[in-house]
């Protein structure tokens, strides 16, 4: 991590000075020019332009230009970000006290086709902590392949992936809402000339009446329903890249300009 900081500083014309303390390493980044009124340090000036200079931990966020980067640049950004407050031990997650930063990290990971869960941990003292957790072994493998972690944690991640090499991925990363059964009952089955009992037989399951329609359906099962009824709309829904998630919170943001 120190080498990465030293190398990055060179891009601003800054020659870093590294000093080993008792149990940590201090990196000094002296300005390459004399600082006077209106003349800022090139690194702090850059951070000001990104609007992330001198923020508290709970105020931090991903600068807007990062979201416009190419996938390989986003991966590099996350690789070094994970080396700060990320974890790869019991699970792969990034921790922060800033909800906005957590949402930004999750959005960047989704750009790389890596799905996450957002958990909030309320502490007895202090602020709520947010954990952006990489969901499931398949996403962990993709995270290790596409992003990784800089430094020692990167080697820990590799060991974690090797140790879980025989773990089979669960394909059910989400469930299509139960409302889709209304389409099956009133469109798919009548068009196919099938009854609900015949559909249950085609799916290799016992007929359970209306109980089947009360819960969400996995993509795998929905795909089999689509095949049994020859419903192309259902087939497209089962294979789409739209992820379904339960709405758990609505937070007002105040008046905003819309277009």
Name each region found by the language model.
Residues 1-259:
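Internal intein/HINT superfamily modules and their associated LAGLIDADG
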């Amino acid at each position: 991590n120190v080498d990465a900081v030293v190398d990055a500083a060179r891009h601003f014309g800054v020659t870093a000075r590294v000093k080993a303390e008792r149990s940590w390493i201090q990196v000094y980044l002296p300005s390459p020019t004399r600082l006077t009124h209106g003349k800022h340090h090139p690194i702090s000036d850059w951070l000001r332009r990104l609007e992330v200079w001198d923020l508290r931990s709970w105020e931090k966020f991903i600068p807007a230009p990062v979201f416009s980067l190419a996938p390989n640049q986003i991966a590099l950004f996350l690789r070094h970000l994970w080396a700060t407050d990320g974890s790869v031990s019991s699970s792969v997650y990034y921790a922060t006290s800033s909800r906005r930063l957590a949402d930004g990290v999750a959005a960047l990971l989704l750009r790389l086709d890596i799905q996450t869960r957002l958990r909030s941990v309320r502490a007895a003292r202090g602020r709520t902590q947010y954990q952006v957790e990489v969901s499931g072994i398949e996403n962990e493998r993709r995270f290790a392949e596409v992003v990784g972690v800089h430094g020692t944690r990167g080697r820990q991640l590799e060991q974690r992936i090797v140790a879980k090499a025989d773990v089979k991925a669960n394909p059910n990363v989400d469930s299509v809402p139960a409302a889709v059964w209304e389409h099956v009952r009133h469109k798919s089955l009548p068009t196919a000339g099938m009854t609900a009992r015949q559909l249950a037989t085609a799916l290799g399951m016992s007929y359970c009446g209306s109980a089947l329609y009360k819960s969400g359906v996995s993509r795998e099962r929905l795909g089999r329903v689509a095949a049994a009824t020859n419903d192309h709309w259902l087939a497209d829904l089962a294979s789409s890249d739209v992820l379904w998630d339960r709405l758990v919170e609505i937070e007002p943001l105040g008046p905003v300009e819309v277009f």
